[in-house]
């Protein structure tokens, strides 16, 4: 048993170790496969291995896409390593030496000519690795290049490299074909001409990975191009290495070949490679702070059979951070150099003893354009206790959130469309969704209606058509549905309800009447007792027994006490008691006969004669009388019909301001008409009245004021792109020579700072192998790597809040866009924006961490000149300027211990500004945008959330010359074209109207959607001469409503009926489009209006499903038959 237990323990330990060796490689794919030989790439950094194990690595793939066959071929490389000389006890410039040998590797990223192109055509992958080594260990970096078609074929697969397992995860981005950078989809442009046209294209920093391809030919003399780019003194370029770099831009592009004079991407890639030949480091997490011990510069032989040393290296020991694979340029073949523990010299300022990187990674700035962000369509269906929703967009969905739903990460793609499915657990409140910068609202009331209709129809499935028609009315939310249920129940079985309810009411009334009767008799008896007692006390004295001290009510009771109590007997039950007051009192509490004398007195009192009262009347009421039942039945039907029709009214818009002019449709102009209110930035406002003369009501003029939603226009200064990065602290120690003698890889980083402690070593700060004190250098290097663009920043120069105001006063039609503290003045009307409550101010910085359609953050303390690492805006790439690096304000300290290598310490901040902002993002003000338009100098948008408010004042003067104002000559023709949506539901309906305008060129007015009795929605519109298409949205109505397009009191001849309120899919509505307030002072629906609505409903039923009427009449007749059987006519006998 012990052996089995040990074996099981070893298996579990081995299984846990294998789980720890699984790493993820993410490959980002566009969701629309474009034409051309596009490839996608991914990489993953792996933990270090022993040198001998690393040299035996072979990539293995279990993916259903075969790896390119040439990757399994043995690759001969020249291995150059260094070691200490045996005859040297202390370090010096000649105390170490290099050795060169040939080793065989499999699967390194020494790609052959046309390999990637063949892999694309043959649907194969290219899996290879890079090595970053010191003298004892290597860190592998696995790269994978696959055709873009693999994104459709695979979601994930497993690749092996030595002891490691790499899970390849294909992740679809919301980009159609572009590259995801800064949260936006960027499409690079390769034309050089477009770079010259400033402002035509955007500039973005895009990641790039390049692989050197060795191939001979006159067209592949790469050193000649490098000589031109660097102006070095290399003359013998024909005998140098020949080949080119194959690059993939942004992890998703067709191959970019460098050098090339026709592709700007190629030119930028080669320039960046020459500027920083070591590229990005390969530090793992936690290796930001590391120590190198530099042995010094040394030469080696390439290839190993060379007669003399021809390649320059820098020997080091410590954590390997940069690639150990390079290409020797000294011959046309370009031997691959494998140099563990050695930095190859990659600086191309000279021609001798240098190499080119085999694999290079970095960032390049490219011109291009960002993909258009399309609005989302969202719909939901009822699913169980909640709702199942789906959002889709023509392009992609860059951001979707909801405060009321659980938005999943599951995406589906159909061609260029992206779909996101999610679940909302509650439908008792409206579903709010933010998608692609738009606020969508799903009115869940309609979902509940649909479930109700389904349930009622299923319950009466024997007659589904009739049940469906009745369910449509029953399931309307609110009072209308209950009124429908009451009306149908009363019509069919009203007599049962009348009898039952009347009987219940009578029982309750008789119960209370009996209680009141008994209570009055008891009160009369108590009054008599009180009078007897008072008379006895006046004539004979106290009624308190002298023995037991009990207060009696009658004389007989007192006489019994005087006889029994002295004899130790109870005067009521004659039980023996102790002759003490306490004993008697205790007995009286349990005695059952204490009421004996009271009952005798009640019998002697003559009861009061009662006349026929309420109780008797209730007992005689004939509630089963057919006359009573019929009268109540008809009355209830009339009242319920009126209440039913009245309940199908429109949804009243509640303004979010206090209007001090409680206007009506007609306003006599005795005084000036003034409105003063605050209006949310996302709201539109329409005010319409008919102004009449105070002297003659026949003289009038129409007033129509339209105020659009607020527009925000800003003048900005584009600060450029904001970057995130990782700060590294590296210590480089060498025993001899000045610090300036050596080049470190971080010298080519865009942002770096170095502090040198030169010739400062002492005996307490010296490794054992150094020759003495004051001979060497400790270089403390700070540099930023893994740079990644995260957003764009704009400095606010001016902010302008404006609204478009249009006024139709009689024939006069004028419009103007007014700003804050500005007025629009006509002869009779004055509209002013008095002030604006805003969160923006001049000097603020707007930062967009993604598409501008998704909104941004407001920074009050954005640094622009002297920036420290960790400040907002610390790492910037201004447009048309060089890279802007932050200041490192901390102090360096060299920490020493006896006989150990010195270590640099830095007391400054090590966290980037972006990471700090994301950790405290809730403390920053944010804003959403809608209908945004932007350039480098201006940004214009509208606020969809209504977070800002304008204080508005409207003044209409009373000095109107009604006599000289003629009638408006504009003639409006109305025709109803189509209808969408449902009546009586939360979603409502949309009526399409064809409006013709004659006799004038422009006319600002409103078109309403009405049935015969009431209007349910209106749209303010500026008509132009000729035909106009106007869509009017409304909510309300009933199954008999025939909706028409109306202008004032005139309506179209034909009306259309909307669908029943139970759509299978409920579409989301754009919040900003629905936020409008319409005020025309129209009168409310009165009693006559209610009867019209009832008649329209009944007419609609006859014109629609008349089978419902037949069924209802059948149940009505059946109900009458039951009434005649259960409540027969009472027969009276003749006397």
UniProtKB/Swiss-Prot annotation:
<feature type="region of interest" description="Fusion loop">
    <location>
        <begin position="757"/>
        <end position="777"/>
    </location>
</feature>
<feature type="domain" description="ITAM">
    <location>
        <begin position="611"/>
        <end position="634"/>
    </location>
</feature>
<feature type="region of interest" description="Binding to the ribonucleoprotein">
    <location>
        <begin position="611"/>
        <end position="625"/>
    </location>
</feature>
<feature type="glycosylation site" description="N-linked (GlcNAc...) asparagine; by host">
    <location>
        <position position="347"/>
    </location>
</feature>
<feature type="disulfide bond">
    <location>
        <begin position="1085"/>
        <end position="1089"/>
    </location>
</feature>
<keyword id="KW-1097">Inhibition of host MAVS by virus</keyword>
<feature type="disulfide bond">
    <location>
        <begin position="739"/>
        <end position="777"/>
    </location>
</feature>
<feature type="disulfide bond">
    <location>
        <begin position="970"/>
        <end position="1000"/>
    </location>
</feature>
<keyword id="KW-0946">Virion</keyword>
<feature type="signal peptide">
    <location>
        <begin position="1"/>
        <end position="18"/>
    </location>
</feature>
<feature type="disulfide bond">
    <location>
        <begin position="751"/>
        <end position="885"/>
    </location>
</feature>
<keyword id="KW-1045">Host mitochondrion</keyword>
<keyword id="KW-1162">Viral penetration into host cytoplasm</keyword>
<feature type="glycosylation site" description="N-linked (GlcNAc...) asparagine; by host">
    <location>
        <position position="235"/>
    </location>
</feature>
<keyword id="KW-1110">Inhibition of host TRAFs by virus</keyword>
<dbReference type="GO" id="GO:0016020">
    <property type="term" value="C:membrane"/>
</dbReference>
<dbReference type="InterPro" id="IPR012316">
    <property type="entry name" value="ITAM_motif_hantavir-typ"/>
</dbReference>
<keyword id="KW-0325">Glycoprotein</keyword>
<keyword id="KW-1090">Inhibition of host innate immune response by virus</keyword>
<feature type="transmembrane region" description="Helical">
    <location>
        <begin position="628"/>
        <end position="648"/>
    </location>
</feature>
<dbReference type="Pfam" id="PF20679">
    <property type="entry name" value="Hanta_Gn-B"/>
</dbReference>
<feature type="disulfide bond">
    <location>
        <begin position="210"/>
        <end position="247"/>
    </location>
</feature>
<feature type="zinc finger region" description="CCHC-type 2">
    <location>
        <begin position="570"/>
        <end position="591"/>
    </location>
</feature>
<dbReference type="InterPro" id="IPR002534">
    <property type="entry name" value="Hanta_Gn-H"/>
</dbReference>
<feature type="modified residue" description="Phosphotyrosine">
    <location>
        <position position="615"/>
    </location>
</feature>
<feature type="glycosylation site" description="N-linked (GlcNAc...) asparagine; by host">
    <location>
        <position position="928"/>
    </location>
</feature>
<feature type="disulfide bond">
    <location>
        <begin position="1046"/>
        <end position="1051"/>
    </location>
</feature>
<keyword id="KW-1040">Host Golgi apparatus</keyword>
<keyword id="KW-1043">Host membrane</keyword>
<keyword id="KW-0261">Viral envelope protein</keyword>
<dbReference type="GO" id="GO:0033650">
    <property type="term" value="C:host cell mitochondrion"/>
</dbReference>
<keyword id="KW-0472">Membrane</keyword>
<keyword id="KW-0677">Repeat</keyword>
<dbReference type="GO" id="GO:0008270">
    <property type="term" value="F:zinc ion binding"/>
</dbReference>
<dbReference type="GO" id="GO:0075509">
    <property type="term" value="P:endocytosis involved in viral entry into host cell"/>
</dbReference>
<dbReference type="GO" id="GO:0039527">
    <property type="term" value="P:symbiont-mediated suppression of host TRAF-mediated signal transduction"/>
</dbReference>
<feature type="region of interest" description="Binding to the ribonucleoprotein">
    <location>
        <begin position="516"/>
        <end position="533"/>
    </location>
</feature>
<keyword id="KW-0945">Host-virus interaction</keyword>
<keyword id="KW-1164">Virus endocytosis by host</keyword>
<dbReference type="GO" id="GO:0055036">
    <property type="term" value="C:virion membrane"/>
</dbReference>
<feature type="disulfide bond">
    <location>
        <begin position="109"/>
        <end position="128"/>
    </location>
</feature>
<dbReference type="Pfam" id="PF01567">
    <property type="entry name" value="Hanta_Gn-H"/>
</dbReference>
